Amino acid sequence: MRSVKLSARGPGILSLLAGLNLLCSNQALSADWLPVTTEDLQMTREPKAPGAPAIYLYRQEDRDDTESVDNVYVRLKILTEEGRKYGDVEIPYFKDLGNVGSIEARTIRPDGSIAPFDGKVYEKAIAAAHGAKLLAKTFTLPEVQSGCIVEYRYRYHSPPGWIFDSRWLLSQDLFTRYAKYSLTPYPYFSLRWSLPLGIPPGSNAPLLDHGKIRLETHDVPAFVSEELMPPENELKYRVDFIYMGKAQPDPVKFWKSFGQKSFHEMSQFVGYPKDMEPVVAKVVQPTDSAETKLRKIYAYVAQMRNTTYERQKTEEEVKRDRQSPDHSVKDVLKRGSGDASELNNLFVALARGAGLRADLALVGTRDEYFFHRQLMNPGQLNANLVIVNLDGRNLFLNPGVPFTPFGMLPWNETAVDSLRLDDDGGSWVSTPLPPVSASRIERSAQLKLDRNGSLTGKLTIRYIGLEAAWRRVAERNEDETNRRQFLEDGIKSSVSAGVQIKLTNSPDWRGSDEPLVAEFELEIPGWATAAGHKQFLKAGLFGSSDDRTFEGSMRTQPIYFDFPYQHSDDIVMELPAGVKLASLPKNHKVAASTAVYSYETSADAHDNLVHLSRYLSINMLLVEAKYYPELRNFYQSVRTGDEEQIVLAAAP
């Protein structure tokens, strides 16, 4: 999110803030509720949204950047029993960037009588993104039933003295019959808006009318959410608003100017290489190779306290620990801590102090939105990384994100454009995508089958590369109990039958280059099923989550994988006495001619041991929906292979 600090004399200085843009706006809360028509009360279905559990009858969002306030009004029609869940309301917001208040709500019964909301509003954490804590005001409306209308309104206050880039999200989770939007811009900055996906059919583009930007929409289809799709907000109809100090319609000139300004700010923060030489001398040896020096500096920065990824502090802790802002890497060194961006700046300074060429690059992560240069939105460059030229090749590094292996980037910074800063405005460089073999899950199991058909034994899982990194980041602030539950739940989701699992080791949650290794005791009651004098065992023990992928025959959205990966299983199963192997499952091998996916299984036996191998490789990121049938066929082949049977019979 980009913000602008306002001074008493007028416009201030642009600064970047990482995070999501705020959901904003509505009508003045002092106004009366809108009238309710008989037609809306009697409505039982919406022909333009067949089968919908509920619809938005009306939405209004009014934002006033001159007063740092948004007003939001929402009215829904509950059409089915399933739709009653929309009586539980969540209003998301970032605590550090504003607050939600003046909440009013009511339920309109099918007979037109009113049940006002007079209950309690709660606050809960619902997500964390880039270190910013996303909270929600939550409440439950009274007497919500099929046929009723629920409506609520609230006011969002931004911090005084700041204005924020913003957006209107026109697509919602439900069909929207009618919606109105307005924005009163701050008059001392140029404001530009864009519509990345255009506008909903039948609606007109936003217009500037008497000092306000206005838009009305109607009959906007519900947004279709599907598994493995790009970030939702990237696919929704929306209007992005961006404040600029000076209007610049040419993207090339815009980014050149922005790059020069960013380079100047970075240079001031990083300082001169010679200033870092005393620190570098304590970290590296003169005889170290260039790569060894770089690795040591990387490890030195990565182990520093990273305030971006700490747990959310209480208000009391914030007041107690309040510190003046860092103005240079010297401040970061003095404190021994910094946020993710500051640590990457320190890494640049130390690498330069060691005689290496290191440049800071601004990057747009691809977990919430995709970066588009033509939109000229600096707020989309919401993170940074470091590019080091080592022996003629560029290394892309990010010690500012914990547990990132040396030579890799966090998954959401791979395969995207980055602006490598220099005094001429910078240059665009694509960040690398790691090879498919760099991120793996390797499962190894030694199991015994008893005469009742239950499997017991030991399972070892090695999470490698990005598969380890994202898990370590996700669990960084959790205790031992939650981490154990996290790993055990991952196993349970991959086995179709009820599995009893117990973690038996202490995984290394603080590592980065090393795999995350978890060891378990495992029991699967009744894995073998009896039919007559034979027993049947499904060969694909750990493939349940893959087998459930892309079950639907139709697809609306593109397919999106976070990063390329490989999964491999190596299972040795000991058969019980008195049982012989009647037949092994068929071997399977399926692969795309372009090597973007492959699947292979094999089975063999020796004496009373059965050896099963399984390999799955996904080497793609973004796939158009038109290729869904081919990809679905592949996963159906995976399902077929995993459902192959081992057949056992009584020994003579």
Predicted regions and their residues:
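N-terminal secretory signal peptides that target proteins for export/translocation
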Residues: M1-R9
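Bacterial N-terminal signal peptides
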Residues: P11-S25
